[in-house]
Amino acid sequence: MRIVLVFLVSIFYFWANISIALEETSYRVIAVNQIYEIREYDDRLAVQTSQKNGQNGAFRKLFKYISGSNISSTKIEMTTPVTQSIKIDMTTPVTQKFQDGEMIMKFFLPRKFQLKTAPQPLSEDLSIVVVKGGKYAVIKYSGRSTYKNFERHSKVLLEALATDKIKTVDHPIKATFNGPLTPFFLRRNEAMIRIEWF
C-alpha cells in the first residue's frame, strides 16, 4: 500500500512540474481583489482553428501543427494557456451555452517567434493570428476543465464586474493550463474577459 501511495504521489508531482516548466504567456497584474485580478497583456502570436460542437478535433489539429505538421516541419514547444472562446455576436446573451456555437481554440506560440518567422500551417483550417493586447479580468479556479465549471466561474466573474461597474467588451474566454493527466485538484483553470480599464 505504501509503495502504491509513493508511486501515485510521484506521478502527481511529475505532471505538476511539467506544467510549471512550460512557457506561459506573460502579463502584468495591475489590480487584485478577493474574486478576480486585472491583467494587462501585450500583443501575442497564436495559431488558431475553429470547431463546431466539440473541442477534441480542434486540439488535435493544433497539436499536430506544433508537432511538426507545418511548412518547415518545425517542432514547436507547447506553451500555456490553451484558450477557447465562442464565435458569436456580441448581441447574443452571455447565458448561451459555450458549446452551442463555433468554438475557437488557440495555442500561443513561444515568444521567440514573430509573425514573419512563425512556421506556416499546412492545413487550411489553421491560421497564425496576432491576439491584440489589452486589459482582462481573470478569475482562477481548480478542478476539471469542463464547460460547467467554466460557466459557473464565468458567472461569478461577470457578476463581480457588474457590481464593480466595470464594462466588459467581449465574451468570457476559457483558459486551460494543464494536460488531462494532471490530477484535477492540481489543475489551474481561468475564466478571463476583456474589459475597459483606465
Where do the model's predicted regions map?
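A solvent-exposed interaction/effector surface
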Residues: R2-F198
